[in-house]
Amino acid sequence: MRIDVLTIFPEYLDPLRHALLGKAIEQGKLAVGVHDLRQWATDAHKSVDDSPYGGGPGMVMKPEVWGPALDDVSSGTASTQDLQSALPHLSKPRHDDIHGVEARSYGESEDSDKPLLIVPTPAGKPFTQADAQAWSAEEHIVFACGRYEGIDQRVVDDAQQRYRVREVSIGDYVLIGGEVAALVIAEAVVRLIPGVLGNRRSHEEDSFSDGLLEGPSYTKPREWRDLQVPDVLTSGDHARVDRWRREQSLARTWQRRPELLDAAELSDADRAYLETLEED
């Protein structure tokens, strides 16, 4: 996969070289280019914004800058050095690489030669785990990180000639710019590229992978500050452990995100357990 990011703060995207994404770069599964949008500004001040038509507060990012930038990135003519991994020591396998199962994709990318353009915006469609799974099969993803009052809408409209455009929100709140959202989405997507995480079960059992929140996790020691690991987890009875984990997942979802239960695939045993929670 290749990821390109257009931003006026290239340094903000340095985390893309670290941790899991750095590992993917080191493995050759990911290439990342971060582009300074001001390279395409033509005035002496390298300005990228102007006042909005119709009046109002704030500034709007200019189409004369964004248009050529997106043109160059889509055609591969933008000049930038790809990020280098900050983790050059990852030639050694880690525990989740050793015990993994066969890597395979979650699906195929959309049948199109156009790159996927993601525009983070609070006015966008909510980003979901299903999006992350689908986009993990993409060959080329471009992030357009807006600032101020956003990007001139004509940029988004025009980009549809060269891209498959998705305006996406990561939550019902407003950030200063799209860089944080780009980091969030990139990590959610890249970790699902086959072979990046190592053990496929690590993300098959994640929150939202089956429509529910993930339950609590425990490790050694068995007792810590007078708090015990639940006995069922040390029982050796795998069927009991699986059922306990399922019930914990159901309970946490019921308590924190009950609306998710409407779309989740629930067994008769699941429904019976939820009824006991409601009775309590």
UniProtKB/Swiss-Prot annotation:
Residues 74-84 have a biased composition (Polar residues). It catalyses: guanosine(37) in tRNA + S-adenosyl-L-methionine = N(1)-methylguanosine(37) in tRNA + S-adenosyl-L-homocysteine + H(+). GO terms for biological process: tRNA N1-guanine methylation. The keyword Flavoprotein does not apply. Its EC number is 2.1.1.228. The keyword Metal-binding does not apply. Homodimer. Specifically methylates guanosine-37 in various tRNAs. It holds the Pfam family tRNA_m1G_MT. Keywords: Cytoplasm, Methyltransferase, S-adenosyl-L-methionine, Transferase, tRNA processing. GO terms for molecular function: tRNA (guanine(37)-N1)-methyltransferase activity. Its main location: cytoplasm. S-adenosyl-L-methionine binds at G146, I170, G171, D172, Y173, V174, L175. GO terms for cellular component: cytosol. It is found in: Cytoplasm. Residues 71-94 are annotated as: Disordered. The gene is trmD. This is tRNA (guanine-N(1)-)-methyltransferase. Belongs to the RNA methyltransferase TrmD family.
